Design a protein with these regions (language model features):
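Long, low-complexity C-terminal extensions of enzymes
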Residues: 303-313
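Non-heme Fe(II) oxygenase catalytic core, chiefly the N-lobe of the double-stranded beta-helix
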Residues: 48-60, 68-245, 263-265, 276-299
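Fe(II)/2-oxoglutarate
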Residues: 1-58
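Gly/Ser/Thr-rich helix-start
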Residues: 62, 259
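Ligand-binding loop in jelly-roll beta-barrel domains
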Residues: 260-271
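Conserved metal-binding segment of the jelly-roll/cupin
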Residues: 242-257
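ATP-grasp fold ATP-binding core
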Residues: 65
């Protein structure tokens, strides 16, 4: 088993196969100005989406967008709101914990998207009116997708998560996941797109997410990531990319990954973890009815602020 897995993750990513990417770093595709220029044209938007879908399936399974948010003040205001939410939840005794890390290592805001819509609707509208989120989400899932988010803060000294896969089978133990037939294991990743927005600068010492490119192609992976030999292989071969504030990484949920160890002494490394779900397979976490109603004014702003698609002339 491990030999088959190793053969898959030994694949290399070549920039020549991805004309809209700016570069390849540590086997991961990095997108920036070339993509920005392309998606402003009528033909470039769908062509870029086709390339991104290929990168997430046949390619490394992960892409990074430089300066996904052009206005850093929008990111800063969202960060302030998330930190205020963490403080409020701790004071109320309802602070969230990270299910893939030791208790106390990280801070979590579960359901961060709808909480932001309620507490800071203007910030919500500015933050999520983002063409890169639209581009990559529709590339993977098509229209009518649903976005949810959970904020994860790895505090100084916070230890790495164990390597895992995500929705939906990734949240089950091996016994539960084994009850589902093979075609469900193949289908599950197609129902969700995982993303992480860097809400602060993330040099390696702060513990940015660890990834294993091409690991999503291993079909038994939802069972294998529980096995110690796969955990050990991941720890010896992972990729860890530093990110700058406003960068965004998106990846196939079947990719083996986990937050890294924060060895810094002062930086609370904050990532806004996005789960973008197909209308045919919603995420287990759903925005509450009250939050959806309270966010109606933000939704109006979102539609007004959402970047226009290129139109034929």
């Amino acid at each position: 088993m491990i030999d088959d897995f190793a053969a898959l993750v030994d694949q290399q990513t070549y920039l020549s196969d991805y004309p809209y990417a700016d570069t390849v770093e540590l086997n991961v595709l990095i997108y920036g100005q070339k993509l920005r220029a392309a998606i402003g044209t009528t033909s470039g938007w769908p062509a870029a989406q086709t390339e991104l879908m290929r990168a997430l399936t046949d390619g490394p399974g992960m892409v990074v967008f430089k300066q996904a948010f052009g206005d850093l003040s929008v990111v800063d205001r969202a960060t302030e709101a998330f930190l205020a939410q963490i403080t409020a939840e701790k004071a109320a005794g309802v602070a969230g914990r990270d299910h893939f890390a030791k208790p106390g290592a990280n801070d979590r805001v579960w359901g961060a998207l709808d909480k932001l819509a309620v507490t800071e609707p203007a910030v919500f509208a500015e933050y999520y009116a983002n063409d890169i989120i639209v581009l990559i989400s529709e590339s993977w899932l098509g229209p009518e997708y649903q976005v949810t988010s959970q904020v994860n803060v790895v505090n100084p000294g916070g230890q790495a998560q164990t390597a895992h896969r995500d929705y939906h089978l990734g949240f089950m133990d091996a016994v539960a996941a084994a009850r589902f037939p093979a075609q469900v294991h193949r289908l599950s990743p197609a129902l969700t797109l995982q993303g992480a927005v860097a809400n602060c600068d993330m040099p390696v010492e702060t513990g940015p997410t660890l990834y294993l490119p091409y690991s999503h192609q291993y079909e038994p992976g939802y069972l294998a990531f529980h096995l110690p030999e796969f955990t050990e292989y991941f720890q010896q071969n992972y990729t860890q990319l530093p990110l700058e504030k406003s960068n965004a990484a998106f990846f196939n949920p079947a990719l083996f990954h986990g937050a890294g160890t924060n060895v810094s002494t002062t930086v609370r490394r904050m990532a806004n973890l996005l789960q973008v779900s197909s209308p045919f397979g919603p995420a287990p976490w759903k925005p509450s009815t009250g939050s959806r109603c309270a966010g109606l004014s933000s939704r109006y702003c979102w539609k007004r602020k959402r970047p226009a698609r290129p139109k034929a002339t």
